[in-house]
Amino acid sequence: MRIGILSKNYAAKRLFLNKLANAIYKDIRFYNYYLWKNAHLWFLKIIGKLNMSPEEQASKLFYDYKAILPTKCDLYHFFNTINYSKKQPWVISVESGVPWPLEVIRCVESSNADLSSIKNNRYVKRALYYLSLPNCRGLIALSKCSQNIQLEILNQFPEYKEQIVKKLITLYPPQDLIIKSISEKINYTKKSKKFTFIYVGRDFFRKGGRETLQVLSELKKKYDFNLILISNLRIDEIKYLRSSHDIEDTKKLINDNLSWIEFHESLPNNEVLEKIKQSNVALLPTWMDTYGYSVIECQACGTPVISTSLRALTETNDDKVGWLIKVPVNKLNTPIHNTKEEQDIFHDTLSKELYKTIEYVLLHTDEVQTKSQNCLKRIEKYHDPQKYAKKLDLIYNNKISELRNNV
C-alpha cells in the first residue's frame, strides 16, 4: 500500500509514519494546490516576516489539501488536514477537532464552549461535507477529549453528523515500553542520591516551567531534592508570559540555584530518556497541551507524572499512575485563560495546587514505586504498538465499523 503523507514531523512519526510494515510512504505536499496558492505566506514565514499567531499560521497554511496532479497513492493519511477530493481514499488523525479554523478555536477555548456561532461558517460546512463522503475512511481522534470536541462541532451540522460519526473513533497513540520492569526502574533511580524531579519542555512558559521553578524554589527551603531541567526557555506564544521580565527572572532563578538544579538547554533524545529513567517524578503543570506525549513517554520509563487536569491529560494521567492538578476548564476540558482576570485565576490556582501536590509527594515518597509499576501496566494496556498497527490497517482497508463495534 502506498500512503500519501504531508510531513515527517513528530506527530506523523507518532501516529502513522512507518506503522505498517507493508506500506510505502510518499510525501505529497508539493502536489497541494493550497501550498502554491499560499506561496507568498510561506515565503514570509521562511524569512520570519509572517505576522500571525501560531494558531493563525496553522489555519492558513496546514489544514487544506487538494491534489493538482495524480499522486499515485492508494490512500492518504493526514494530521488535522482536510482532503478536498471526492474519490481519493483518505484517513485523518484529529488532534482537537476538524476543521480547525480560528472561529472554531475561539469557541472551543471560550469559558462556555458555545459553538452555535459556527453554524453559518461556510468553510466549516464545506470541510464537513468532504469528511462525510465515503472516500474518507476514518477520523481518528487522539483522545476521548478530542472525540468530544469533534462531536460538539458535528452537533452544529446535523446534516453531516450521522455519516461522520460512523467513522469517528479514538485510538490512543502507540508507545513502546522504555523499561521493562519495576526492578529496572529501581536500579535507575538508585543512581540519583536524592529524590529527583524532572521537567522537559521547549515551550517553557506554556508548559508551566515558570510555576515549576517558583514552587520548587519555595519547597527547597523545607525539603531536600534535585531538579533536572531540560528546556531552551522558548516562548511559543506571548500570551503565556506573565510579565515583561519573565525570561530574565527565570534565568536568574536557575543560575542562583544550580546547586540543586541540573540545567540543560537541550539534549539528544536518548539522553533525555536516560534522565527521565533516573528521575522519580516528572512534571507537566501545563497551561495548554492537546495530548501531552511526554506523559506517556515518562510512564513508559516508569516515571509517574504530576500534570494539570486539562484536555487529554485526564485520560493519560490519574491518581493510580500519577497526580492531577485541578485547574479551571470548560465543558470540553479546555483550559479557561483568555482574559487577564482568567489568566490570574489560572496562574494562582496552578501555583497553589502544584505546591500542595509536590509537597504531598515529598511527604509520601512510598507511593511513587506503586505508581511507577502502574505506569508500565498502563502503557502496555492502552498504547501497545502492535495492537495500534492492526487497528490502523483495518481503518485503511475501510473496516472501521469492525473496530467501532468492538469498542
What residues fall within each predicted segment?
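Conserved donor-binding/catalytic core segment of Leloir-type glycosyltransferases
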Residues: 140, 175, 179, 188-207, ...
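A charged, aromatic-enriched C-terminal amphipathic alpha-helix characteristic of glycosyltransferases
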Residues: 59, 345-356, 360-397
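Short hydrophobic beta-strand element within catalytic cores of glycosyltransferases
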Residues: 304-307, 317, 323-325
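Acceptor-binding helix/loop patch of EC 2.4 sugar-transfer enzymes
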Residues: 43-45, 92-127, 329-331
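Short alpha-helical segment that forms part of, or immediately flanks, the ligand-binding pocket
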Residues: 273, 296-300, 311-315
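Aromatic "clamp/platform" in nucleotide-sugar-dependent glycosyltransferases that forms part
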Residues: 287
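A short, active-site helix/loop in glycosyltransferases that binds the activated sugar's phosphate group
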Residues: 131-166, 177, 244-245
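Nucleotide-activated donor-binding/catalytic signature segment of Leloir-type glycosyltransferases, i.e.
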Residues: 231-233, 240-273
